[in-house]
Amino acid sequence: MIRFAIVAIVLVVAVGLNKLLSKRTVQAPTQASPSMPTQIDRKDFSEATKDWLVLAFTSSSCNTCADIERKAVVLESRSVAVDICEYTSHREMHKKYAIDAVPTLLIADAQGVVHKGFLGPASATDIWAALARVRDGQPDPHEGECS
């Protein structure tokens, strides 16, 4: 009888410990995703009087950044300013706008409101089309989609 009681107690303790430990499972860590600014101060960048700003945050060690720079500079016009903020020479701007991934390309209006942004590689067609849409006041057909 005593053996049965000891076995029952050990069994109850084992089941209790199992339930307690199974509740303490470690959740997978949440990965922060890179974010883009929604507002910028146009005075921080060249030609603040133009209607639009195409702003590329880049790094000299990034091959994709060089491609984005080439695609951005051709957008400059009478109403569109283009500014390239390379990390080593504009580190303070990367910190101010919390740029944590490059290339980041933003299209902002005269008040500094960011209407469209690209994180990572983007085609020239997509960048041109995005600028045309925001200048014409058209909604982004891909807004809210995950890619």
Go through each PLM region and give its residues.
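N-terminal targeting signals for export/organelle localization
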Residues: 1-36, 146-147
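Short gly/ser/thr-rich secondary-structure transition/capping motifs
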Residues: 35-40, 84-88
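Local sequence-structure signature of Cys/Sec-based thiol-disulfide redox active-site neighborhoods
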Residues: 44-71
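Iron-sulfur (Fe-S) cluster-binding segments and ferredoxin-like electron-carrier domains
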Residues: 67-81
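Thiol-based oxidoreductase modules, predominantly thioredoxin-like and allied folds used
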Residues: 78-93
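Soluble, non-transmembrane catalytic domains of enzymes that act on hydrophobic metabolites at membranes
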Residues: 100, 105-106, 125-129
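A short, hydrophobic beta-strand/beta-hairpin element that forms part of a small beta-sheet core
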Residues: 103-117
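Thiol-/selenol-based redox modules, centered on thioredoxin-like
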Residues: 122-147
